């Protein structure tokens, strides 16, 4: 789980650079992410379980996974016109409750006295996340981004749900291994977006930028593979990945001496306390 956080933090910083400095749009970023990650995954696939059952469930998993990834990037582009990436990650705190409830419903986690404490720590982490989000002080037009925001949250939650549903370690039912379904989903995305992006022209005009973004997807491969493993074991742990990335980015901001309010610092500390408390219980 910590490895996922480290890898995705690197990718978050590189994506920010790609948008701010290289001026890549959502389609270009999604294509580079999908194509480069799928290509790099070829080196890992021979060592993966590569479970594939010829059934509608396997193809459904691939299509649904491709859809969630496409929605994630497309909707994020709309939402980020009104709020920062930092604030968007804070909103993912809502999925913590949904994910742990899913673990309880599926039998991955047992309902008991510890569940009360876990929900309390989830609530604590969520409070910290929203404090961080509000620390920016910018007025956000939620009427404009309400539907995209809901769709984005459902896409992030749905990705983990797809993995746990089509390859459940608890029940022993697995139609397609998470890594293999992700690989086919990324290939599908790359093929669909290629006509819009014009890859050859892109690499000719922005060679260094496109190569930089592509190479930074090496940690993305490691992160995605490990994320899939986490999602098959626990939806709650999967949901905690993004808040942990938020906390890491928060500390990076402190190290770089970026402007930071008291509300921001307090939110970071509270969020960390919630994450640690959840893992301990």
Q: Residues of each region from the PLM?
A:
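Hydrophobic/small/kink-forming positions within alpha-helical transmembrane segments
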Residues: 9, 13, 66, 70-74, ...
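Loop-to-transmembrane-helix transition segments
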Residues: 1-4, 32, 42-45, 50-75, ...
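Hydrophobic transmembrane alpha-helices of multi-pass small-molecule transport proteins
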Residues: 34, 38-41, 93-104, 114-135, ...
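Transmembrane alpha-helices of multi-pass small-molecule transport proteins
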Residues: 3-14, 21-71, 121-127, 176-199, ...
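C-terminal transmembrane-helix exit sites in multi-pass transporters
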Residues: 76-79, 95-117, 229, 247-266
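Glycine-/small-residue-enriched transmembrane alpha-helix faces in small-molecule transporters
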Residues: 1-24, 117-123, 139-175, 222, ...
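Structural motif at transmembrane-helix junctions in multi-pass transporters
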Residues: 21-27, 75-91, 108-111, 168-175, ...
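Membrane-interface helix-cap regions at the ends of transmembrane helices
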Residues: 37-55, 104-110, 127-139, 165, ...
